[in-house]
């Protein structure tokens, strides 16, 4: 069959949601296209497999590199992106974070009706099944299973206690009443298994007769006739053949913040200057395609630990490593059930800010270069991440060849405020590490090291060592009708093209304060109702800490 009502490009966090919800209508045919394969790998299922997935190019990882970064000593940065069913939800760190309520109220204030916190909270709740049951902020019956941090490792509780000793708030639920403070993470893990968007949304509906899923196919362009998307051209990686598939109703582009703009550009939709430079005929001029790229930049501060309780000792040697895999594969038991990242914090680098601008992830290992460098010492890391970048980058073309990687210009730390916030984050986490609660677990600061003290020294270390923490958004951003740089409207329809929507992290107008998997799933849940002509879920005014409300 070469004609479907809906064609979804990309089986990632958003595409899996759309495939599930749109195929609920038995009279509609749905085609889900995925360039990668299925998600049957043990490394995907096993939470401890995350390190082996995120650090190298392979069947589950596109493994992109940025162009040289001018503010990071001209380095090209590693950009892992998920490939295959589940997309990046199949290779990420499994941290379930929605962002701050004011992130979404900011979208509404930008003129994007229906995107305030009260509007999106019902869709977060609909998607979620929180271990132990729901409450005012959490769902209990959704496809996405979410658990609470459960590791008994004392470093997690010690970092939270040290945060309190340093004078920072504590919180029990980053996704509830109060985001700010130190506390435990919630995780997309269920019964010791990764719970990706594919696991939650796609697998349960694979038997539906109106849903067709193709893997190993690259979408080379979207077909436009008389101002309407009529279908797609795909390339089969096995047969090396191209074919055209028609869409009766809509084409839904859910290829992510890197590849959604790239596919639009290959289709002749984008900035005419960019298209002309690569000999691509302009089908529809839309200057904002690929612009407005935002991402969370991150540095890894690490401390050596005198106790053999971190990933190095727990996995040291071939026998232990094989034992972890075998115990998990045969019995579903042991360290394979953990992703070694269960506590963290959301903090403000200045007291005048209305919400946190720093996020901390505590990892039970000395992290260097996305875990590619194995440090033969026990230790732990504070990932220090700047949440609200003022810097903007872009995604462009390297060539007109649809099989070429896109060109990624992240443009990290171009703004002084971004540099100031990250520098302050380094100082704040040193203050936390100096507290008595962490004293039994620290012998020395591994990185940046005691010789890095002045602003200039910290800035130089950041330029040498900063990396992505994998949250790119904004390259097909949502906006109002008068916004020349907006790519889609508040219903994710591509401006000026009928029958075409972008539904993924690329539509976020501003980067939310936290990990981006849960917000991407929420966006797809919300837009699936729009596509189906269903009324939006009623707004939900759950209380959130702010002016006039007392902190927890």
Stretches found by the model and what they are:
Residues 1-552:
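N-terminal redox-cofactor-binding region of secreted/periplasmic oxidoreductases
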